[in-house]
């Protein structure tokens, strides 16, 4: 049995009129505020950087922080957090300026993993520093010889930086999991 097959002929779109204005790229519905490439995401990155850098500077300004491992860990973790947040803030500024979405699967994976690692390190360092600060202040009662105010301030700033980093991680992880 010989059956004829329909042939498909491509149909070209008529050329766009020269008077039409090209629409700028728009933000997808998936881009909730707080995600990378949004204004709230940029604000979260800015506050992460600000508080992590402040914690780093306050702790590094004391002369005896290198003698305690937890305080050295806090300096390293907040240094990493501030560099990560600053780099991603610059990426967010670029994405906002050119109106592009940062919802590429690989980018979201990178952001989620990086945010998870840096926020976990910052939280662990803040907890360790808080433990040492409580030991020095309450248990040993030796704040007169130490920089307890700077230690407590730096620890509090590290916790605030973690509070700003946690939503970024959760938004990126949620975006990655919902694909």
UniProtKB/Swiss-Prot annotation:
Subcellular location, principal: membrane
Stated name of the protein: CASP-like protein 5A2
Family: Belongs to the Casparian strip membrane proteins (CASP) family.
Transmembrane helix found in the keyword field: yes
Compartments where located: Cell membrane
UniProt membrane topology term: Multi-pass membrane protein
Residue segments, region Disordered: 1-24
Assembly information from the UniProt record: Homodimer and heterodimers.
Domain of life: Eukaryota
Extracellular side: 60-70, 137-155
Topological domain ranges for the Cytoplasmic compartment: 1-38, 92-115, 177-179
Keywords attached to this entry: Cell membrane, Membrane, Transmembrane, Transmembrane helix
Residues annotated as transmembrane: 39-59, 71-91, 116-136, 156-176
Pfam families: CASP_dom (PF04535)
A Gene Ontology term for the protein's cellular component: plasma membrane
Organism: Arabidopsis thaliana (Mouse-ear cress)
């Amino acid at each position: 049995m010989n059956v004829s097959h329909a042939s498909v002929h491509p149909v070209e779109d008529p050329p766009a009129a020269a008077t039409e204005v090209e629409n700028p790229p728009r933000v997808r519905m998936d881009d909730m505020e707080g995600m990378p490439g949004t204004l709230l995401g940029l604000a979260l990155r800015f506050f992460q950087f600000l508080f992590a850098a402040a914690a780093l500077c306050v702790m590094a300004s004391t002369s005896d922080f290198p003698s305690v491992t937890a305080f050295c860990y806090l300096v390293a973790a907040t240094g990493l957090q501030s560099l990560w947040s600053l780099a991603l803030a610059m990426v967010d500024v670029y994405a906002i300026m050119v109106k592009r979405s940062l919802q590429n699967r690989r980018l979201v994976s990178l952001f989620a993993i990086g945010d998870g690692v840096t926020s976990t390190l910052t939280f662990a360092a803040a907890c360790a520093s808080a433990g040492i600060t409580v030991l020095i202040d309450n248990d040993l009662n030796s704040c007169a010889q130490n920089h307890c105010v700077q230690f407590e301030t730096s620890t509090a700033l590290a916790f605030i930086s973690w509070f700003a980093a946690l939503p970024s991680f959760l938004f990126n992880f949620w975006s990655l999991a919902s694909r």
